[in-house]
Amino acid sequence: MKKSPEKITLGLLQHPCGPDPEANFATVLAATRAAAADGAQVICTQELFRTEYFCQSENHDIFGLSEPVPGPTTEVFQALARELGV
């Protein structure tokens, strides 16, 4: 007999981004904590959550906004995921 898949609660984060990457990051971290407190087991952010959406055209001047993976943002999320158990 087939086993039913386990139910998983998702937290899907979407927010407007302003010009301050650190303020955007703080918003996402707070929303991540709130989603975990509401029972989310897997939490997904929107793409480019630290910056305003700039992908309307290819602009090499803003390529410096990218980060390596692993890098500073993923390290913070790894620690937060461990702390929250998500």
Question: Which residue ranges define each predicted feature?
Answer:
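Generic signal for short, ordered secondary-structure residues
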Residues: K3, Q14, N59-H60
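Cys-nucleophile CN-hydrolase/nitrilase-fold catalytic domain and related Cys-dependent amidase chemistry
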Residues: P21, A30-V86
